[in-house]
């Protein structure tokens, strides 16, 4: 039986991406990033949606070319319906619907957060994917949550941030340090040359599995303001140690709750997903727990950590196999609950 060929389209934030999947195998995964947001210290929604309009056709054409297929071979089109920036989502949704009509191919809506988690089932991402049930720490600039994954489309959020996401905390603290946006990768890189024990910052005291990252941001801000009064060059002179200390603090907060959830539920299958899953300290903490706690860990390839269409195509493939299609009246939504099947 010939494998289905599915196009995935991702446009939830500031990356325009398209991918082709056949079965569980990714044939192409193309992305256009938007450097324009760096000078503003964050994503500007209006600029993002305009850039998507410019990028979406060349990105899709390139993904088809790289996959070495013809456009009429596409069996279905998967697109990110949400959550995300509404203007950005509308570009991808509208184009997906138009292309589906043109090709007379079925349309498949995809939840962006589910896609991050289910990227672990891409063939080249993980030859041995997680076994159900598993826990997935999903961490990005917009979301931080512990998800109990019972089946492909049966997921339960058992813990989440009550304020800032972990990636957002990295970016806001990076702004305090006068680092470029996005600050997370820069903090990670500078941490390699710093001492993680040089400075200590407050940790939240929350019951259960929920997170809070607004406290560490405030703690760092007050600490820096105090030190700059004594030495205006304090940040510049201590940037590596500051980055290493902040990174250690944030990763410890993330791992403490994840360890508690895994212990309470008796689950050893543990995955991470989302942009912050590229962080070297988080990956190292997972590897240490593999040895210390006997976890079976699942760490995504770097190309599947940030927003990408390969993960959208993967979910679309799973829904295609189930015959779960969307109709042309489907609209983008900025809020889209994770456990919506």
Swiss-Prot record:
Cellular location(s): Cytoplasm
Cofactor note: Binds 1 Fe(2+) ion per subunit.
Binding positions for Fe cation per the UniProt entry: 112, 116, 307
GO biological process terms held by the UniProt record: tRNA threonylcarbamoyladenosine modification
Gene Ontology CC annotation, any one: cytoplasm
UniProt GO molecular function: iron ion binding; N(6)-L-threonylcarbamoyladenine synthase activity
Enzyme Commission number, as recorded: 2.3.1.234
Residues given in the record as substrate binding sites: 138-142, 171, 184, 188, 279
Name of the molecule in the record: tRNA N6-adenosine threonylcarbamoyltransferase
Natural source organism: Riemerella anatipestifer
């Amino acid at each position: 039986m010939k494998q289905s060929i599915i196009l995935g389209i991702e446009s939830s934030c500031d990356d325009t991406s398209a991918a082709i999947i056949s079965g569980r195998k990714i044939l192409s995964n193309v992305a256009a990033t938007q450097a324009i947001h760096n000078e503003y210290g964050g994503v500007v929604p209006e600029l993002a949606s305009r850039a998507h309009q410019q990028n979406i056709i060349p990105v899709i054409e390139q993904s088809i070319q790289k996959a070495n297929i013809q456009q009429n071979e596409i069996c279905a089109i998967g697109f990110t319906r949400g959550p995300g920036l509404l203007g950005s989502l509308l570009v991808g949704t509208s184009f997906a619907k138009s292309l589906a009509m043109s090709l007379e191919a079925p349309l498949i809506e995809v939840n962006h957060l589910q896609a991050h988690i289910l990227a672990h089932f891409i063939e080249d991402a993980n030859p041995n994917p997680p076994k159900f049930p598993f826990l997935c720490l999903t961490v990005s600039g917009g979301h931080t949550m512990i998800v109990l994954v019972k089946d492909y489309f049966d997921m339960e959020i058992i813990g989440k941030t009550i304020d800032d996401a972990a990636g957002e905390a990295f970016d806001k603290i990076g702004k305090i340090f006068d680092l470029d946006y996005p600050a997370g990768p820069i903090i990670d890189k500078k941490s390699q040359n710093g001492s993680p024990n040089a400075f200590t910052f407050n940790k939240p005291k929350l019951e259960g599995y929920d997170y809070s990252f607004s406290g560490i941001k405030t703690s760092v801000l007050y600490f820096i303001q105090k030190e700059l009064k004594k030495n205006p060059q304090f940040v510049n002179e201590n940037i590596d140690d500051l980055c290493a200390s902040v990174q250690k603090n944030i990763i410890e907060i993330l791992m403490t709750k994840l360890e508690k959830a895994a212990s309470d539920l008796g689950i050893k299958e543990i995955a991470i997903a989302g942009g912050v899953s590229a962080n070297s300290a988080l990956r190292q903490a997972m590897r240490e727990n593999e040895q210390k706690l006997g976890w079976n860990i699942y760490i995504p390839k770097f190309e599947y950590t940030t927003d990408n269409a390969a993960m959208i195509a993967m979910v679309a493939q799973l829904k295609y196999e189930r015959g779960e299609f969307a109709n042309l009246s489907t609209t983008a939504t900025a809020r889209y609950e994770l456990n919506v099947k």
